[in-house]
């Protein structure tokens, strides 16, 4: 007798893959269908993990809980599949006005943001496109 499928997941992009992985780890029988469509969002999305976003440089919703869980999940998946899926990256954000510089400065002083900010960053190592930039925010981020 065939076991009944507990979950049917349509699409095996980043979200579908992680959801199916988590459900399988919990003992559920999962079926994933995917048409391999080249215009699927996972082929277009950069998979960027940016903990500080928006004009006011606020922490992304639930980021303190989500990043550690994401890293644990990807590391577990990497271990099982012998691949590399989560990559830590530096995010450079150009500060184009005094307002933006002031907002960023307030984040530098806020301890709740410190684990996501790189303060002493050698900007001379940045790409030549940033050579005329007077001020920038350096954020610890990642990508999938």
Predicted regions and their residues:
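Hydrophobic anchor at the start of a short beta-strand
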Residues: 7, 30-31, 115
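Helical element adjacent to the flavin cofactor pocket in flavoenzyme catalytic cores
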Residues: 135-144
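Dinucleotide-binding Rossmann-like beta1-alpha1 core, especially the glycine-rich loop
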Residues: 48-127
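Short beta-strand/turn micro-motifs composed of small residues
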Residues: 11, 34, 95
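Glycine-rich FAD pyrophosphate-binding loop
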Residues: 24-43
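Beta1/beta-strand and adjacent pyrophosphate-binding region of the FAD-binding site
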Residues: 2-15
């Amino acid at each position: 007798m065939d076991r009944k499928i507990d979950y049917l997941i349509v699409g095996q992009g980043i979200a579908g893959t992680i959801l199916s992985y988590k459900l399988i780890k919990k003992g559920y029988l999962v079926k994933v269908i995917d048409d391999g469509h080249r215009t699927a969002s996972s082929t277009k999305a950069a998979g960027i993990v940016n903990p500080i976003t928006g004009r006011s440089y606020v922490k992304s919703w639930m980021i303190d809980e989500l990043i550690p869980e994401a890293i644990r999940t990807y590391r577990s998946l990497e271990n099982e599949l012998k691949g590399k899926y989560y990559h830590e990256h530096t995010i450079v954000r150009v500060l184009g006005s005094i307002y933006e510089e002031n907002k960023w400065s307030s984040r530098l002083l806020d301890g709740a943001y410190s684990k996501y900010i790189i303060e002493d960053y050698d900007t001379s190592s940045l790409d030549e496109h940033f050579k005329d930039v007077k001020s920038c925010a350096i954020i610890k981020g990642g990508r999938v």
